């Protein structure tokens, strides 16, 4: 299947996260869980498990998802998104990490966009049957103020949205400043 690569996990890494997935799958309450329900289970864990957003989580080792889910319970968007994706894949939900920028400021005087490194963000996409790839922002479960709701990942129609969707005027790139 074309989705197989989005289920792959490196052998020997994050054994506690794999064990968590196995325990969730054995739980009778999850006996008929579909992909969307597994997303809900993971997001609920993030919301209620004492996880927090920080730009200074310390150094993670080779089992970074295990450290996030069980030890540190803290990280920034890359830690949260990658740990979420590893759990999704362990639950047999095709998932991938997406990185980009969320935000930016339009200068109305000269019509330039300023996108800063602080606007960088990482989130996840999961494959839902009949819907295709769906954006999920696990950081929003940990730090709603950092990212807002999932809907904020779908900006209002405009230059940046058009750029993301591939319908942008090529001249837009000339008006972006990093």
Tell me what each language-model feature is.
Residues 42, 73-101, 124:
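Cysteine-centered nucleophilic/redox motifs
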